[in-house]
Regions:
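A single, central transmembrane helix in multi-pass transporters
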Residues: 11-19, 58-118
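Juxtamembrane intracellular "pre-TM" segments in multi-pass secondary transporters
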Residues: 37-72
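C-terminal transmembrane bundle of multi-pass solute transporters/carriers
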Residues: 26, 54, 61, 93-257
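Helix-loop junctions on the cytosolic side of multi-pass membrane transporters
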Residues: 18-48, 246-257
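Transmembrane alpha-helix boundary/hinge residues in polytopic small-molecule transporters
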Residues: 3, 69, 86-87, 177-181
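Glycine/proline-centered helix-kink
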Residues: 1-6, 10, 86, 118, ...
Length: 257
């Protein structure tokens, strides 16, 4: 798949890829509105589903331990989608002129890192503590900053390809590690009657920001230099993550009733 994507990205404009992704997410979200499970058992299934989703959202907002997961996951999806998913293909194929074959190898490193991270997590599970992975998420922000800086240095084919391979590998590794940490934390620390709604609410909030991010990034690539996008997204992720961390520390210092 990465190799095929590398060939297609050199033929099809990035904006078209963004449009396809936006359409797919909107169709998926629209289709989920009509999913019905055992609807015959209740006369107001839709109302109950809406109330459960609203209750889970309020629970996440009010729970100081899980609030960082709500804001952090949405922030990750928004920044990574623009700074990596859209900007990196454009930088590699258009700005730097790297071949589609090399782009396929670079993208393959992303998948390779994801697979190895998943295998590593099965052998070495993360600690079962109620704590948001600030370091891992912040590392994604710094990687986006590095991507923007590498795109600005004098181009050298071998160095650039190796650098992007390493960075994409780390992105794949961190993305899976963060996702596993989030799901594991919810499964362990959220009560049974809320667990499904909490996972669904986090997913809905995070994924709803992806089309917006794709639209903004797809528009920005024609307005600014491509390296600017990961620099902005990386800075935004690091700064806002720091704000979330400060609010988290402040909330934990407040007396509880």
């Amino acid at each position: 798949a990465p190799a095929v994507g590398g060939v297609l990205i050199s033929v099809i404009p990035v904006k078209m890829f963004a449009a396809i992704n936006i359409a797919s997410f909107l169709i998926s979200a629209f289709g989920e509105l009509f999913l019905i499970f055992n609807a015959a058992k209740t006369t107001s299934f839709k109302e109950q589903a809406e109330k459960k989703t609203y209750s889970a959202f309020l629970w996440l907002l009010r729970n100081k331990d899980f609030r960082p997961f709500l804001f952090g996951d949405g922030l990750i999806n928004f920044c990574v989608t623009s700074g990596i998913s859209v900007a990196v293909p454009f930088i590699i194929t258009n700005a730097l002129g790297i071949s589609s074959g090399s782009y396929g190898i670079i993208t393959g490193c992303l998948g390779f890192g994801s697979v190895l991270s998943a295998l590593f997590q099965t052998k070495h599970p993360c600690k079962t503590e109620l704590k948001y992975p600030y370091v891992k998420v912040g590392s994604l922000g710094f990687i986006m900053l590095l991507i923007g800086l590498i795109a600005r240095i004098p181009y050298h084919h071998i160095f650039t390809v190796i650098a992007f391979c390493i960075l994409e590998f780390i992105v794949g590794w961190l993305s899976v590690a963060i996702n596993i940490k989030t799901i594991t934390t919810i499964q362990i620390f959220v009560q049974d009657d809320l667990r499904g709604q909490v996972i669904g609410t986090l997913t809905a909030v995070s994924y709803s920001l992806i089309p917006i991010s794709l639209l903004l990034a797809g528009t920005a690539v024609d307005m600014v230099e491509s390296y600017v996008i990961p620099l902005i997204c990386g800075s935004l992720l690091v700064v806002l993550l720091g704000c979330i961390r400060l609010l988290d520390l402040r909330a934990n210092k407040l007396p509880t009733e």
